[in-house]
Amino acid sequence: MYNETPIKRRPSTRIYVGNVPIGDGAPIAVQSMTNTKTTDVEATVAQIRALEKVGADIVRVSVPTMDAAEAFKVIKQSVSVPLVADIHFDYRIALKVAEYGVDCLRINPGNIGNEERIRSVVECARDKNIPIRIGVNGGSLEKDLMDKYKEPTPEALLESAMRHVDILDRLNFDQFKVSVKASDVFLAVESYRLLAKQIRQPLHLGITEAGGARAGAVKSAVGLGMLLAEGIGDTLRISLAADPVEEIKVGFDILKSLRIRSRGINFIACPSCSRQEFDVISTVNELERRLEDVTTAMDVSIIGCVVNGPGEALVSHIGLTGGHRKSGYYDEGERQKERFDNDNLVDSLEAKIRAKASQMANRIQVKDTTE
């Protein structure tokens, strides 16, 4: 039940992606990107809705062709979550999706074209009140920067970003955020640190092409965790070669671990050993599966024996400490007379957790209406 994070957020300006506030102390937004063919409207809409169901604040959609832009029009009309159009190479696609109500435009400085093309996109975005993300990527830096630096470096990524920040500044356009992603953790982290010192615009965090579900989650947690702990970051995306739904789950888990933003249950569980009085691993796995729909932020400790169980239960909303045949149950750190049969733990705990989540949600609603 540790509520406050010691992290002090980097000051930044405020923009909006649809109805989602970004920067200036707003909650860090978690986003993902569809991996369907955008021209397959049905599949893309289904995936966006699945992402929204697990808490995605923003969803990015690749729009590589004019046909995809026409599909985007239908997709946008079919979903409620804010959509970012991912644009490369052809600036005219950005102009087209702007007509169709896109909530944000992501452009890549490495391939979007000359300043005149950027000017066209900016003027369109200004007219329609659409923010822009300048998305620098270590894998697609401008040729002159690669010639200058020989390889992606923090200085190269920074120069690419600032080159386009300066263009937007000259055009008096301040509704933008910036990212400087790389697949190497140290390269990405140092690039963001340099950028954070240069501008006050919101920063979108990510370790690009991080890898598969396990390795990519670890790499992202290490890199983004370093930045978030320093107060850097206003939105984030976990790039996994996996189901995009997993990106949202990992993103919230990272924020939850730093006490920056919580959604759903934070399970505190022992890895289990010979002292466990019930099967901790299967119990936790089943509860995680059953309780994915719970959005109330709460801590649940599930410990297999009395060594650490009571201590963890003291700082949990719901706690379970393994005992012989029956396990001890705690509510808000207080030991309850009720004990749970070890053969029926999952059903018993699920009921208690759901009741507690409902109680806590009602408490929050009452507080909001009285303030």
From Swiss-Prot:
Annotated pathway: Isoprenoid biosynthesis; isopentenyl diphosphate biosynthesis via DXP pathway; isopentenyl diphosphate from 1-deoxy-D-xylulose 5-phosphate: step 5/6
Reactions this protein catalyses: (2E)-4-hydroxy-3-methylbut-2-enyl diphosphate + oxidized [flavodoxin] + H2O + 2 H(+) = 2-C-methyl-D-erythritol 2,4-cyclic diphosphate + reduced [flavodoxin]
Cofactor: [4Fe-4S] cluster
Cofactor descriptive note: Binds 1 [4Fe-4S] cluster.
Keywords: 4Fe-4S, Iron, Iron-sulfur, Isoprene biosynthesis, Metal-binding, Oxidoreductase
Enzyme Commission number(s) of this protein: 1.17.7.3
Signal peptide, first to last residue: none
GO terms of molecular function: 4 iron, 4 sulfur cluster binding; 4-hydroxy-3-methylbut-2-en-1-yl diphosphate synthase activity (ferredoxin); 4-hydroxy-3-methylbut-2-enyl-diphosphate synthase activity (flavodoxin); iron ion binding
Protein residues bound to [4Fe-4S] cluster: C270, C273, C305, E312
SUPFAM superfamilies recorded: Dihydropteroate synthetase-like (SSF51717), Nitrite and sulphite reductase 4Fe-4S domain-like (SSF56014)
Family annotation (Pfam families): GcpE
GO biological process, one term: terpenoid biosynthetic process
NCBIfam families (UniProt xref): ispG_gcpE, PRK00366.1
Summary of the function given for this chain in its UniProt record: Converts 2C-methyl-D-erythritol 2,4-cyclodiphosphate (ME-2,4cPP) into 1-hydroxy-2-methyl-2-(E)-butenyl 4-diphosphate.
Family: Belongs to the IspG family.
The protein's name in its UniProt record: 4-hydroxy-3-methylbut-2-en-1-yl diphosphate synthase (flavodoxin)
Originating organism: Shewanella sp. (strain ANA-3)
Lineage: Bacteria, Pseudomonadati, Pseudomonadota, Gammaproteobacteria, Alteromonadales
